Amino acid sequence: MQELPSGYKGKILYTADCTRELPADSYFENGATKVAETPVGRYREACNEPLTRFGYRFQIEHPGKPHMAVITYPDDKRRYMCVNDGTCYDLTTGVFTGGVYPVTHTMQRIENIFWPRWKDCSIVFMTWGYGEPAAVQGFSVYELDELPPAQLSGAVAHGGRSLGVQYEDPCGKGASEGAKTFDEWLERHITYLHHTGQNLLVYPINWYHGPQFPSKTQPADAFYVFVAEDRKQYSRSTT
């Protein structure tokens, strides 16, 4: 079991040892996986080909409350791994090891905060770069009691540099933070920024494919992306 980091309180809902074999109603893989026996430890590893992946199904009790997935992965060679829920951006993060980042030959952790939108949830580990396979030892999912603001002191609390999140694509609002409305997305995003000591949010008003505002000269797309109960993404746009 992966423990919560220091300072967090919550209830454990699910834990997985990824080296164990599980039934088809709680585990899947696309492309063969293997259980590797290494000096770092035992872990499950996907194929070298991009988009090969394995994933787990788990249940939570209270959609809309903040949760944390604590994931242990091997830092023993070059890897490029995507982590997501298979549907939207609620649980999305990634891992790079090797290359410009010298490997530590140890197990490392991701501590990923997310707001699940369903009781029936999933988590997927996917190879994204050729020859850089996804690999995980295990993970645990917790429902958190709260997400209090970070306790900042001194000059940091009264200024200092700007630190925050810049969206490359307009993928937020209805497709991340488990949100179903713009107000819900903004509230959760601000809660997360305060919790992590960040003070800046940059969101695109124009991107590769066009503006995010009504325009007389160019079609506007992706005003709003929404993940519905059927687990499909829908979007509004102009023509």
Question: Residue locations for each model-derived region?
Answer:
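Surface-exposed beta-strand/loop patches in extracellular or lumenal glycoproteins
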Residues: 53-57, 79, 125
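Glycan-recognition and processing domains
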Residues: 1-62, 89-90
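Glycan-processing catalytic domains of CAZymes
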Residues: 63, 69-76, 86-93, 97-104, ...
